[in-house]
UniProtKB/Swiss-Prot annotation:
Catalytic activity annotation: N(6)-acetyl-L-lysyl-[protein] + NAD(+) + H2O = 2''-O-acetyl-ADP-D-ribose + nicotinamide + L-lysyl-[protein]
Co-factor(s): Zn(2+)
PROSITE patterns: SIRTUIN
Alphabetical list of Pfam families matching this protein: SIR2 (PF02146)
Subcellular location: Cytoplasm
Record-given protein name: NAD-dependent protein deacetylase
Catalytic site: 123
Any one GO MF annotation of this record: zinc ion binding
Cofactor binding mode and count: Binds 1 zinc ion per subunit.
Residues bound to NAD(+): 29, 33, 40-41, 105, 107-108, 123, 195-196, 220
Alphabetically ordered keywords of this record: Cytoplasm, Metal-binding, NAD, Transcription, Transcription regulation, Transferase, Zinc
Annotated source species: Caldivirga maquilingensis (strain ATCC 700844 / DSM 13496 / JCM 10307 / IC-167)
Coiled coil: none
Transmembrane feature ranges: none
Lineage, uppermost ranks: Archaea, Thermoproteota, Thermoprotei, Thermoproteales, Thermoproteaceae
Length: 257
């Protein structure tokens, strides 16, 4: 999509958002690639290089040492990442009263780092770990330090149980999905950013908005199966598209005052 098409799509999206009553953002891995975090299913995606089974609860239970060897490198990448313009734009749209919730599939904590307040994390957050035995929670940096000191798997200082990341692994339920779907059913606009809408049940969230008579905006570099279902589609980078949308929203709001 060229700059002209992105600009036109950004304007249309801004009009929809400024006229909304309760808009939500739904974000996937594509919003964080510009922060240096690889996505999962793209050409350089994580699951093209590694077996997804390495991120399963079964693997953690059967080989916690191997699990941590795989995850520690990914967590180091997350720990070094910083919010990009797309995260910052969503946070500003929330401050302007446009976006009511950010519902994310990501575990990278970048929405909170950018200043978003109402964030629902469907798949958890990498910044904490907890003991599989006593459930005591600790900062991820404690597990990282223990691992770097040669303790693999890292263990709970309190009871000696194995520590695990506070994220949803393959084979585990998505506990926050019901809350997200309830919010979606009350919303009139879903702004999808950086998601191919192929991972369920998470992908149901923006679709519920549309099914309840709301509007659907999709910002994703690659086409999705729901592009024809959407009201506006922008095949642009997340930061470029959201920068356009934010500026257009500000212009519309200024003109209305």
């Amino acid at each position: 999509m060229g700059n002209g098409e992105c600009l036109e799509g950004g304007r249309k999206a801004a009009v929809i958002l400024t006229s909304s009553r309760h808009a939500i953002a739904f974000t996937g891995a594509g919003i964080s690639t510009e922060s240096g975090i690889p996505d999962f299913r793209g050409p350089q995606g994580l699951w093209r290089r590694f077996d997804p089974a390495l991120a399963s609860i079964d693997y953690l239970n059967t080989d916690p040492k191997g699990f941590w060897e795989f995850y520690i490198e990914r967590f180091r990448v997350l720990n070094n990442a910083r919010p990009n313009k797309a995260h910052l734009a969503l946070a500003e749209l929330e401050k302007l009263g446009i976006i009511k919730y950010v519902i994310t599939q990501n575990i990278d904590n970048l929405h909170q780092s950018a200043g978003s307040i109402n964030v629902i994390e469907l798949h958890g957050n990498y910044t904490t770990v907890y003991c599989m035995r006593c459930k005591t929670q600790y900062p991820f940096t404690l597990a990282l330090r223990k691992y770097e000191e040669g303790e693999n798997p890292p263990r709970c200082p309190k009871c000696g149980g194995i520590l695990r990341p506070n994220v949803v692994l393959f084979g585990e339920p998505v506990n926050e999905i019901n809350r997200a779907l309830e919010i979606a059913a009350l919303s009139d606009v879903a702004l999808v950013v950086g998601s191919s809408l192929t991972v369920y049940p998470a992908a149901y969230v923006p679709l519920v908005v549309k099914e309840h008579g709301g509007r659907l905006i999709i910002i994703n570099l690659e086409p999705t199966d729901y592009d024809d279902y959407a009201d506006v589609v922008l095949h642009c980078s997340a930061s470029e598209a959201l920068d356009l949308v934010l500026n257009e929203v500000k212009g519309i709001m200024a003109a209305g005052n």
